[in-house]
Amino acid sequence: MVDNKFFKILIENTFLKITSKNNNLVKRFRSFKRGSSPKDQDFFCIEGTHLIKELLKSGKNPSKILVTEKWLRKNQNLSKKFDESLINIVSEEVLASAISTINPDGIAALVEISAIPNYQFNRKDDFILVLDRIQDPGNMGNLFRTALAAGVNAIFLAGGAHPLGQKVLRASSGAVFHLPFLRFDGIEEEILSSLLKSLSELSNVGF
């Protein structure tokens, strides 16, 4: 049963519904829809209830949220986990215009990239997977999901698709949030040099 008192406060007293597709926050979400690379941003975008749940399960929190009234009605308990100041109610049409999901289920969020920690070189018994220039986002996401199920502790990425890109996140089913990773960018020689340096650091801690 919906807590009508909670919902009334949520809608009437706390938030201002966004109905314009030209709203600045909506435009910011839309920039990720156009394919902006997460490596050039301070934030990345996640879409859908499942990824939101996985983000929270991993101990991380969103910075900005777009959500429909319908979603709030259906997910009252989950919505209570968010700081009210982060929530921005939008119409279903506005949400659909802002994100890449064809049939969005009612929620999307921006997350600070700094909230996703890099791997720390302090454990000699870690199980580390090294991926060399995996370009296909679907394959990258599947590898993250499989690695998590297999007990991998961290992933080193020598270029390739960015793990915080939309297609990788969807394919990983949120596994990216649970696996620390290091990504090495640049020309081939720079990537190899950075990777070898990191492997050397592992050796120094007894790996």
Predicted regions and their residues:
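Boundary-proximal intrinsically disordered activation/regulatory segments immediately upstream
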Residues: 6-73, 160-161
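Short active-site oxyanion
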Residues: 40-43, 61-64, 85-86, 153-155, ...
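RNA substrate-binding interface of SAM-dependent RNA methyltransferases
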Residues: 57, 88, 116, 121-207
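Short, aromatic/basic amphipathic alpha-helical patches
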Residues: 73-84
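Short, hinge-like loop/turn segments at secondary-structure boundaries
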Residues: 81-83, 107, 171-176
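Glycine/small-residue-rich loop that forms an oxyanion/phosphate-binding "nest" at active or ligand-binding sites
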Residues: 87-108
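Short, structured interface segments
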Residues: 106-116
